[in-house]
Structure formats: C-alpha cells, structure tokens
C-alpha cells in the first residue's frame, strides 16, 4: 500500500535522477490548466490522461529554495514532492522541504533511481542547503520515496564512504562548501535592527544599520536637500498668552512632516495651518510655497485623523509642553501622593520590607523607561534628531509626529514626576523602618471642597513652602547668570 495515496505514478518516469531534476527545474511550457481533455469516444472508452489533483490554497509561508541544489516543495495536503506548479496561482512553498543528501548517496549506473527523500530531516525554519551537514555523521534516518518505503532494503543507493568517513569538517571547509555562508560579524542581520538592550540604546548614531541610519533614512521620509531650516511662513500661535501675540516660524521641514505620514494634510488643512483664508491670494501663496520647495500634496489625501494638535506648530506645541512641565514641577503634590501610596500599600497587609522592595523595583522600571526615551529625540523644529535603530524608533516618532512634537517632552515630564513620587514614598518607608512616624495630614469631609477645611497653620506652611521653592529657583537663576557674565 502506498504511503502517498494521492501521488499518481502511472505516467511517472524515474529512469534517472538527472532526468527527474531536469523535469523539475524546466517544466513543460504547457501547463495542466491549458491542456484540454479529449472528448470521450462513442464506445465509452475515455482517453487515459494523467490525473490532475486539484490543489487548495495553502498558508502564505513563502520560503524560496534554489532548485539547482536539489530542493523541491513539499505539499502538506497531498503529501507529494513536486515543484512543477510552483508558479501557478494557489500553489506555494509549504514548510521546510527535507534536504537532498547528494554527498552521501551515489546512484549506481544503469539502474532505475528513485530520488532519495529524508522524512523531514532537519526541517527547521532556517534556510539550509544539502551541503550543510556534509561534514557530520552519515544520515541514519529512514529514507522515503513517494511510492513506498523501499529505500531501507533497496540496493539502488550506496553510501559515499569517501565523504562520510572524513569526520566533522572544520569551519573553513564548511564555508567553502556552503552556498549561503553566514557572516556572524555582520550588522545586517534582521534581528539586530530590532534588538532592544542597554548596549544598543547607548551606542552612537554612526553604528546604526542601514534602514534606521538618519543619513540614509531621515525621519522615515524621502531624503531632500538641505533646505529644512528655511522659514516658509511666520504664523500666529493658536494659544497666545493674555495680552500678547505670539508668532512662530513654519519651516520647510515641518511643512514636509505635516504633508507626510501619519497626518497627510491636504490643501484645505494647510490653509488652516498657514492661518490663511480660502481667498485666491492666500491659495496662490500656499501653492507657491509648496511648488518652490517641491512638496507634493496628493489629491487623495482627504481622509486624515484630525486632533486638537493639528493646527499647532511644533514650536508652539513644545512651548506648551515646557509650560506644563514647569506647572507640574511647582504644583503637583509629590509628598501627598507618595504618602497616599505608602498608606495604601500598608493597608493591603504589606509589611515595610515588602513595601520598600515594591517601591524600589517600581523605581527601577520607571528609570529604565526614562532612559529609553531620553536617548531618543524625534525630529522637530529646533531639535536634532536621534535614532537608535530598533523597532521603537518608527512607532515613537509617529507618536511625536501626531502630537507635533508635544508627546516626547510631555512623556518625559510625566515619567519623571512618577519617579519623584515613588522615590518619596520609598524615603517615607525607610524613615518608618527607623522608627519615625508618617507626616500628619488633614482629612476632608466627603463632598467638601479643597481649602475649605484647611487649618490656618497648614495654609501658612503650604504658602511658605511655595515661597521658599520660588526663592531657591530665583537664586539659582541669578547665580547662573552671574557665572556666565563673569
């Protein structure tokens, strides 16, 4: 009984291994789909034709193997080895085909030879050639043919002991025989591009491989001439301070970023971005800027994601991030949040040792996140771009592009605030371990507004703390200005 019931062998000719490989490598120009079946004869005897088995589409797992090295595609559904239909629709490479052991077996002349097939020998997801294992031990697994298991008792194949008795070959011999040598020192391996570790985070930008090298692929866009810092227009800000009118420079580089991914601004959005009305003079002005600097706006760019950041220029967005950072540093109640966090941990039946361990581990995690973001700088107006050559670059730069440069400094500001809270909570925990008590706090009545139940002593302490913080900052600024002048 055949191991491959769907493999038709009535019309197969395995007279020699070379002829079989010739048929595989150079299939007949007339495909099975172009041949017509002869009409049935009147007496009911139909013409005998090779049976064509319908093939179902397989999973899209494309792995090409060179046919001249003995590879064939293995069809998992019909359990056959062939590549005559590899270029037809619905056919493809399925899995890893077993290697053809050309070095181990030599066909005896003058005898019918069935091509040797090793049952899934070394069937891994890496690309191999028949010569990969030529210096190792002889193949000891059972050999199979498409018809039946005949190779264990067949005398058609004789081991080539001149090859197999030489022992394991050295690396120099393996590199000579291997048609696909692996260069372990090369930086072109795919996983190197997406390797996220401390060494790659701290390496210089000159060592970044090709796809992420900013000299080759700046800001994941089309390389252009050095006109990026040219001011295309001076426009008013969207969030001017009270009593002032802020103006910001719209550079050519920023205009290219707005017209590219992920926003793809169309001309209607650019009119708002330029703070221009849709009058003829304003329309011509915007079109002239786009034409002068060779910026293409596709007519299909109609469906885009509009956010509150869409009308902001990058200078204004980063100024907003700086103001938010200074407000957070001044008014965020770090001590009160840290005290609340520690009380919650103790309330959940955690002793001080466990609380301190949790807080220190959390601090390490936040520190790692901050370092990961600090070594990067998405391209915005007035900032030099920094890429690190892994998978975070593209997604994080898209985040920065969508927020017009606001996302990166704002994220760093938030994580640094979280770190201060955790560090202060750990400091309170260490003081409690030494016998100190937690600072007292005043509890508000539910539904009562802040400051309504605040005592006079606490209010004075709160105001004095703010005053001392402001005085220290002014003194620091004065010392820095004095040192620069001297």
From Swiss-Prot:
State one molecular function term (GO): RNA polymerase II transcription regulatory region sequence-specific DNA binding
Q: What happens when the gene is disrupted?
A: RNAi-mediated knockdown causes embryonic lethality and morphological defects in larva. Embryonic lethality is exacerbated on the transcription factor aptf-2 mutant background.
| One Pfam assignment | TF_AP-2
Q: Which UniProt keywords apply?
A: Developmental protein, DNA-binding, Nucleus, Transcription, Transcription regulation
Compartment annotation: Nucleus
Q: Which GO terms describe its biological process?
A: positive regulation of transcription by RNA polymerase II; regulation of cell population proliferation
Bias (Polar residues) ranges? 150-169
Q: Looking at the UniProt record for this protein, which Gene Ontology cellular component terms does it annotate, in alphabetical order?
A: nucleus
Q: What domain of life does the UniProt record list for this protein's source?
A: Eukaryota
What does the subunit comment say?
A: Binds DNA as a dimer.
Instruction: Give the protein family.
Output: Belongs to the AP-2 family.
Q: Which function does this protein serve?
A: Sequence-specific DNA-binding protein that interacts with enhancer elements to regulate transcription of selected genes. Required for neuroblast and epidermal morphogenesis, perhaps acting in cooperation with transcription factor aptf-2.
Q: What name does this protein carry? A: Transcription factor aptf-4
UniProt organism field: Caenorhabditis elegans
| Primary gene name | aptf-4
């Amino acid at each position: 009984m055949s191991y491959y019931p769907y493999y038709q062998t009535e019309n197969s000719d395995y007279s020699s291994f070379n002829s079989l490989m010739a048929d595989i490598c150079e299939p007949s120009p007339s495909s099975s789909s172009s041949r017509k079946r002869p009409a049935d004869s009147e007496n009911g005897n139909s013409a005998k034709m090779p049976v064509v088995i319908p093939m179902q589409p397989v999973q899209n797992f494309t792995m090409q193997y060179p046919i001249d090295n003995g590879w064939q595609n293995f069809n998992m559904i019909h359990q056959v080895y062939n590549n005559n239909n590899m270029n037809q629709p619905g056919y493809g490479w399925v899995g890893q085909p077993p290697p053809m052991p050309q070095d181990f077996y030599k066909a005896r002349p003058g005898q019918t030879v069935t091509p040797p097939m090793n049952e899934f020998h070394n069937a891994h997801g890496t690309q191999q050639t028949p010569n990969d294992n030529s210096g190792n031990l002889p193949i000891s697994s059972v050999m199979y043919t498409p018809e039946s298991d005949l190779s264990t008792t067949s005398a058609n194949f004789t081991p080539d002991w001149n090859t197999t008795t030489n022992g394991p070959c050295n690396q120099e011999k393996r590199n000579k025989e291997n048609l696909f040598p692996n260069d372990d020192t090369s930086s072109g391996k795919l996983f190197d591009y997406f390797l996220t570790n401390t060494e790659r985070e701290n390496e210089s930008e000159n060592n970044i491989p090709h796809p992420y090298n900013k000299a080759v692929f700046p800001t994941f866009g089309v390389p252009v001439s050095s006109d990026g810092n040219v001011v295309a227009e001076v426009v008013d800000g969207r969030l001017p301070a009270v009593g002032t009118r802020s103006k910001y420079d719209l550079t050519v580089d920023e205009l290219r970023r707005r017209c590219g991914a992920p926003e793809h601004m169309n001309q209607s959005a650019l009119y708002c971005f330029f703070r221009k009305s849709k009058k003829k003079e304003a329309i011509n002005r915007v079109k002239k800027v786009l034409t002068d600097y060779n910026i293409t706006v596709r007519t299909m760019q109609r469906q885009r994601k509009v956010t509150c950041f869409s009308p902001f220029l990058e200078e204004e967005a980063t100024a907003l991030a700086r103001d938010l950072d200074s407000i957070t540093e001044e008014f965020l109640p770090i001590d009160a949040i840290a005290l609340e966090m520690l009380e919650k941990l103790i309330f959940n039946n955690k002793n001080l040792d466990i609380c301190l361990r949790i807080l220190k581990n959390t601090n390490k995690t936040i520190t790692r996140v901050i370092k990961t973001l600090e070594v990067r700088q998405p391209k915005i107006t007035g900032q030099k771009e920094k890429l690190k050559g892994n998978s975070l670059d593209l997604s994080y730069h898209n985040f920065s592009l969508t927020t017009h440069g606001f996302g990166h400094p704002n994220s760093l500001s938030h994580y640094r605030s979280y770190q201060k809270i955790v560090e202060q909570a750990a400091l309170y925990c260490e003081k409690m371990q030494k016998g100190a008590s937690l600072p007292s706090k005043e509890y508000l009545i539910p539904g009562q507004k802040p400051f309504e139940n605040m005592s006079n002593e606490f209010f004075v302490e709160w105001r004095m703390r703010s005053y001392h913080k402001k005085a220290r900052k002014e003194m620091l600024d004065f010392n820095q200005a004095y040192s620069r002048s001297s």
